[in-house]
Regions:
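Transmembrane beta-barrel wall of Gram-negative outer-membrane proteins
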Residues: 180-207, 218-272, 296, 406, ...
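Flexible loop and strand-edge segments within Gram-negative outer membrane beta-barrel domains
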Residues: 23, 236-238, 242, 255-315, ...
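Short, acidic, small-residue-rich periplasmic hinge/interaction motif at the N-terminus
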Residues: 21-63, 99
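Short acidic/polar hinge/loop motifs at secondary-structure boundaries
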Residues: 111-139
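N-terminal periplasmic accessory domains that precede
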Residues: 35, 70-73, 90-93, 104-105, ...
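Surface-exposed extracellular loop regions of Gram-negative outer-membrane beta-barrel proteins
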Residues: 269, 276, 280, 324-326, ...
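Gram-negative outer-membrane beta-barrel transporters
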Residues: 407-408, 412, 421, 522-525, ...
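Outer membrane beta-barrel strand-and-loop segments of large Gram-negative receptors
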Residues: 341-354, 395-399, 491-497, 503, ...
């Protein structure tokens, strides 16, 4: 039998799209129990058989948190730290990994592409939070299932799906936020007829300038109040607009066969880089303009779901997807030209996923193909960000996961994935940089694996031990980028190989009635990591670039590091009306190669919440908190933006917040949120912009 499976893995031809789960969207108020889901207990749409810790955020929690963006969902969960460079941003940090070391996925399609960078990313805002059914946060290396980039974890966004048996259903949400005069209008409708199901949705957002908090309990009077870009507490040039659209169609051609279409479109207006506009040079603002152009994302998925049992599989899901993205960087120093650099990215992908069950055994296997094409252009006379002759990156992978019981109380899981990656970059103009090559070509491969044991010890006790590896293959951003930041010029390096993480973790769970406690301790080794180091080209260690003479740096595989930490969560069910939830996370990381602290490590953070719910009413009071990050605890590589903190580092902070909602009828819900009630001034770790001050949010949701 093993030979048949191996042959199938080698020769299967993908032909469709990954199925998505359907959960009805209804107006309701109740005590929403926070879920910690272990992979083997999740719905099959996720296809994860390894015992990674997974936290799910449901649609009702998303609505009650009133997030500004999908990155804001993660921060308000209390389980993930989020970095902000500008108002339209949000870069998740999971266990000390960020940006291209954390994988973003929507409806089974990878969002990470060939130009995801290593610093901070804002791409997660391209998914409307109101279009989501739920979000799964997968903690720890997850490369067996997801492939490259899943070093620290995975954030999987699941959008709404059309329901069967509904002639017509529509939802309308209106929301206002005082801290930025934000207006949010969302509408969707779905219907079904016979074998067909349809869903369409649109979200319009208009955000004004963001106000910071007034109360400076940290004692730093002028922190974040650069006079030329802050008026009182209003952070100027932080306004932006965004529009998101979704359309899904499902045809149940047979009882066991379905076809699907998934179309998503998102675009913003210009996003000013507040952390660049507040920079000074020789006593004057360094930039007159620094903004991202409209961030545009198109996703089209076509798919097949086949659930008729045969010798090879019980269920088969296939995803064919196409993504088209555009992003640009536009900067202008005072009395200088406006320099525009634009990237167009095209991603073609196909994932075939199979599940076979027998007795109490489950086998999941599949094939994944990803192909990225990157076109980079710039203002005439200036260099492009990436190879000006174009770049492409192709990845093909095969994977398998297996789960079986060893006894009545012990379950075993194991998995492996082999990936082959090819990257090409072509340079037409190399005179200014003096590159010793006209093209770059990399061929890398990686083998990753995972093992897990889950032991149900009895009397509500349960333990899970997991060992897993992850990898990230160098992408176009790592290999071909020409980039200036903090007075350093990054240039291409043709000698890069994948970076790997090795992780072991232990999770202990205790259930007492409807209450539970979960705690995870993890230790991770990061090997062959890609970091910037001083570099030379043709014997030169500096070059003239964009009006400055800058020292040269390049990405190299020169870092070995370790990280360890813990996450804990407690849910306390007091009675039918009252409950309390608490989360806390801590990570420590050290770069052993440089004998220095590792970057992207937030200080201890967490959330405590108490909820009351009765009939049509719900009330929640919660506190977010964050410990100090002292200046001496920052990484020396500059990735954590110490220049945006105080001279002593980033002060500790906590905010008090309120959420209350009421069902006015079966079809109408009203909600009031008051965030940062005490109007505290603070910045989240590594952020270039001050966090929102007191914010009153009014929401009205109608179903018809």
């Amino acid at each position: 039998m093993k030979k048949y499976y191996l042959k199938l893995l080698c020769f299967v031809l993908p032909i469709g799209l990954l199925a998505q789960n359907t959960v009805q969207d209804t107006i309701m108020i109740g005590l929403s129990i926070p879920e910690i889901i272990f992979a083997e207990d999740k719905d099959e749409g996720e296809r994860l058989l390894s015992p990674n810790r997974i936290e799910r955020i449901d649609a009702i929690d998303i609505f009650q948190d009133a997030p500004t963006s999908s990155a804001d969902i993660l921060q308000k969960s209390g389980a993930v730290a989020v970095q902000m460079s500008q108002s339209g941003g949000g870069s998740p940090i999971i266990r000390g990994f960020e940006a291209n070391r954390v994988l973003l996925v929507v409806d089974g399609v990878r969002l990470n592409n060939a130009i995801y960078r290593s610093g901070h990313l804002q791409n997660s805002i391209s998914i409307s939070p109101l279009m989501l059914e739920n979000v799964d946060i997968v903690f720890g290396p997850s490369s067996v299932k997801y492939g490259s980039d899943a070093l620290g974890g995975v954030v999987h966004y699941h959008t709404k799906s059309p329901q069967s048996g509904q002639a017509w259903k529509a939802n309308l949400l209106q929301r206002y936020s005082s801290v930025n005069n934000g207006v949010n209008l969302y509408y969707d409708h779905s219907w079904s007829k016979g074998k067909w199901r349809f869903l369409q949705g649109i979200n319009l957002n208009r955000f004004g300038n963001l106000k910071m908090g007034e109360q400076r309990y940290h004692g730093y009077t002028d922190w974040g109040k650069e006079a030329h870009i802050v008026d009182d507490n209003e952070q100027l040039r932080t306004a932006y607009d965004q529009v998101d659209f979704i359309q899904k169609i499902r045809l149940d051609a047979r009882e066991y066969l379905s076809f699907k279409m998934n179309l998503q479109v998102s675009s913003t207006t210009n996003l000013n880089r507040f952390d660049q506009l507040n920079d000074f040079s020789n006593g004057q603002p360094k930039f007159e303009e620094w903004y991202y152009g409209p961030q545009k994302r198109l996703l089209l998925g076509l798919g097949t779901e086949h659930q008729k049992k045969n010798f090879f599989y019980d269920s088969f899901n296939n995803t064919i997807s196409y993504q088209q993205l555009e992003e640009s960087r536009n900067s202008q120093k005072y009395n200088a030209d406006l320099i525009q650099r634009t990237e167009d990215v095209f991603v073609f992908a196909n994932t075939a996923d199979f599940i076979k069950k027998w007795d109490y055994n489950t086998l999941n296997y599949g094939v994944d193909l990803q192909h990225n094409i990157v076109h980079s252009r710039a203002t005439e006379g200036y260099g492009t960000r990436y190879a000006d002759g174009g770049s492409d990156m192709t990845t093909i992978s095969v994977y398998s996961q297996y789960k079986a019981p060893l006894s009545k109380r012990i379950n075993f899981s194991a998995g492996a994935r082999y990936s082959k990656v090819q990257l090409k970059g072509r340079f037409n103009e190399t005179e200014n940089l003096g590159l010793p090559f006209k093209s770059i070509q990399l061929n890398n491969d990686a083998l990753t694996a995972s093992l897990g044991l889950k032991w149900e010890m009895g009397k509500g006790w349960e333990s899970t031990i997991t060992a897993s590896t992850g990898f990230r293959s160098p992408n176009v951003d790592d290999v071909t980028k020409v980039f200036q930041k903090s007075g350093k010029l990054t240039v291409p390096n043709e000698n890069l190989s994948p970076e790997f993480s090795k992780n072991i973790e232990l999770t202990i769970n205790k259930s007492i009635g409807e209450s539970y406690l979960s705690a995870t301790y993890y230790y991770t080794l990061l090997e062959n990591a890609i970091v910037k180091q001083a570099f030379t080209l043709n014997g030169q260690d500096s070059l003239w670039y964009d009006g400055d003479y800058l020292p040269l740096y390049a990405n190299t595989n020169s870092q070995d590091a370790f990280l360890f930490g813990y996450n804990a969560k407690a849910y306390i069910h007091l009675n039918k009306q009252w409950s309390s939830t608490h989360t806390i996370s801590y990570t420590y990381g050290k770069d052993e190669s440089a004998d220095a602290l590792l970057g992207h490590i937030p200080p201890l953070y967490g959330k405590s919440q108490i909820d009351w719910s009765k009939n049509n009413y719900r009330l929640g009071l919660f506190v977010f908190y964050n410990a100090w990050k002292k200046a001496e605890d920052y990484s020396p590589n500059g990735s954590d933006n110490l220049d945006e903190a105080t001279t002593d580092g980033t002060p500790s902070w906590w905010t008090l917040n309120l959420s209350c909602s009421v069902n006015l009828s079966d079809k109408l819900m009203a909600q009031l949120n008051v965030e940062n009630i005490l109007d505290v001034h603070y910045k989240t770790f590594s952020s270039g912009i001050s966090a929102p001050g007191r914010n009153v949010i009014l929401s009205l949701k109608t179903e018809f």
